[in-house]
Amino acid sequence: MGNPRSPLDRRLRFRNVPFLPPRIAASSTTTARSLKAKTMEMRFTIAWMWFPSVLLILGLLTPPSNGCTVDVGRNVSIREQCRLRNGATFSKGDIEGNFSGPVVVELDYEDIDITGERQRLRFHLSGLGCPTKENIRKDNESDVNGGIRWALYIQTGDAKYGIRNQHLSIRLMYPGEKNTQQLLGSDFSCERHRRPSTPLGKNAEVPPATRTSSTYGVLSAFVVWIGSGLNIIWWTGIVLLAADALGLGERWLRLALSHRDKHHASRTAALQCQRDMLLRQRRRARRLHAVSEGKLQEEKKRQSALVWNVEARPFPSTHQLIVLPPPVASAPPAVPSQPPEYSSVFPPV
């Protein structure tokens, strides 16, 4: 049926367009059904796209509370669990017991980065002995009485090609010498694409062998980074959010561009509708008048169209004509039927 408030509705043909109120003549063509559809679309967008996407972005911006876990190895006890502090990872523990010979410590370090990807580092520490005075005298023996406190320190460098470069250092602190800290290099075996380097300072140059971006190119690193299941979920939400934001931006831009011509377009549509209706009324009147004409009307039209000096009968009038009395016979006619003689008008000289 259409929208009765629309100026283009076919039911307006039978209305008096010049006397239509302006709010009806210039109203939009939005129906109640389309408004309901837009409302449902907005609810669907908020429920299934915006809300999960906002949660995913908040999850990306919020760092994990426990960034890593340390699994104990042989004769190792964890005193303090791994945590994040100022962008660096710390883990502390104690090696307890009485040891004869070199100490072997095996630790599994598992890192959860900000993108939710898990990376496990397995490193092997061997030959750890307490450098007491007795052990210094003995070249081939190392006895540990009491304990050795160890600390794991991992600092994350700048991201390159989607791979984080980490610097790992081990610190050993002995009970007898509390103010002494010794940095030890170790034999590391790293799974996946992370290769921790030897202890480095802040401004130290990273050796080429420890650069993670040298082995993997841009494409392979991107595939490895996106390949995680959790990353796929996050990126799906981000893509949906971007698509919805683009659609909403396009709708707002189109509305802003068409806002200027909205009044002009509605007025033009109303005037065009009025013109069409007037033309239809004229055609309808002509058609009805042509059908009602008979032979008598055609004869009258033909006689009225003749030359002026030919006598024609006038159209009948609704008003009664005033009938004058006939002229007296003795009186000369007011207008002679014959032209006068020449001699009577101009007498001869």
UniProtKB/Swiss-Prot annotation:
Superkingdom of origin organism: Viruses
Keyword entries, A-Z: Host membrane, Membrane, Transmembrane, Transmembrane helix
Bilayer topology annotation: Single-pass membrane protein
Bilayer-crossing regions: 221-241
Pro residues: compositionally biased ranges: 328-339
Annotated region (Disordered), positions in chain: 328-349
Ligase among keywords: no
Localisation: Host membrane
One CC-aspect GO term: membrane
Protein's recorded name: Uncharacterized protein US30
Record organism: Human cytomegalovirus (strain Merlin)
Gene name tied to this protein: US30
